């Protein structure tokens, strides 16, 4: 809350403004967001032409997260007090001419204990993955397999949702930052290569990878492309479009240098094994239009409705492929 303290010394009026921001957790920084001094754009929004109303010039406003989304709701109204002092500075009386009005409360669905645990797990997981990647990169470099060397892991995200209500219980993005020192650290955070201020959980758009397989499975079952007993052989490679220069591999085939495959899997086994070839085959038989229909029904490419800023993402399809410098859409693109 902001309080204006007006002290009178002779004929001089001194105006002092104090700010207090207290956080009860060192976690959830991307969710809570932070405040900063007003920009010129903020001035136009929060200081109308009548300068006797609106925010003071030195007011800090929400810049991200809940602080930004609910700025108007959380802000409250300044209070003023007239303070009388002696010539030596001793306060003789304080008269509150206008009491401050606190802002409203915002209640989140976030379980803070779960949030803290998820952030710790995410940080530890990325650290361990990077150690393994460093070992692999060193090995590939020694063996001269420079095309196998991969970039450092820049970050990650975890979202935990109540499956019955859809409410988010934890939203973690790594790397993160310390809200209690955001002002002092802000310049360094802006220049950091791994972009700690960026909320990867809500604002990043990434390929879904194997998490898309249940969508393909449900579409295939519903459209009678497969049933629960249908078996598809994983030979390690999906070769139907090899003549077009596209023969994607199953992960197990790649990781074992072509030594292992999943053999015959039904849909349950394919999900358990995360068999790429099984789902390449199902997707190919479905076709992109039908696959798009089911993806949209699952909410992919659509806004979730969360109050915080989010990126909706996009599913490649024949209607938007020209945006990616692709001349035409072929069946192999559906598999991909």
Stretches found by the model and what they are:
Residues 1-103, 120, 127:
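Small/polar-residue-rich segments within soluble enzyme cores
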Residues 2-5, 91-155:
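Conserved, well-ordered alpha-helix/loop/beta-strand core segments that scaffold catalytic motifs
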Residues 20-23, 115, 313-315:
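A short acidic, often aromatic-flanked loop/helix-cap motif at beta-alpha or helix-coil junctions
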Residues 40, 79, 127, 131, ...:
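A generic secondary-structure boundary signal that marks alpha-helix termini
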Residues 85-97, 110, 136, 142-143, ...:
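Beta-lactam-recognizing serine transpeptidase/beta-lactamase-like catalytic domain environment
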